Amino acid sequence: MVMTDPIADMLTRIRNANMVRHEKMELPASNIKREIAEILKREGFIRDVEYIEDAKQGTLRLFLKYGASNERVITGLKRISKPGLRVYAKADEVPKVLGGLGIAVLSTSKGLMTDKEARQQQVGGEVIAYIW
């Protein structure tokens, strides 16, 4: 069976693992998933990312992050631009998530970046997901 939206699958796997408080999770790798995982690590939503090479496409292992009393760091993930309905934002219309408490992941002409980085570089693009 062909997966129509691998990014939504990634976000759902993270959400499910986070809900049951798994320490780590694995998912099939791709370049865009790897970039999203690196953004999550850089922004402090996950502890670490490992790429595991295999004969096929490889695997990403994400180490989820929890607070001191085991509270979730990631409280929500939402796919915005979908294969059936793409959502774009101009440079001056880049959205803020929860008043700046969360991040929006954008695919721009300069690569994948957060909403803060897109505003600093004054670029717009496709709004991939919201994470808070």
Curated annotation (Swiss-Prot):
Keywords: Ribonucleoprotein, Ribosomal protein, RNA-binding, rRNA-binding. The keyword Transcription regulation does not apply. Pfam families: Ribosomal_S8 (PF00410). GO terms for cellular component: ribonucleoprotein complex; ribosome. It comes from the Bacteria. The keyword Cell wall biogenesis/degradation does not apply. One of its GO terms (molecular function) is rRNA binding. One of its GO terms (biological process) is translation. Part of the 30S ribosomal subunit. Contacts proteins S5 and S12. One of the primary rRNA binding proteins, it binds directly to 16S rRNA central domain where it helps coordinate assembly of the platform of the 30S subunit. HAMAP family: Ribosomal_uS8_B (MF_01302_B). Belongs to the universal ribosomal protein uS8 family. This is Small ribosomal subunit protein uS8. It comes from Exiguobacterium sp. (strain ATCC BAA-1283 / AT1b). The gene is rpsH.
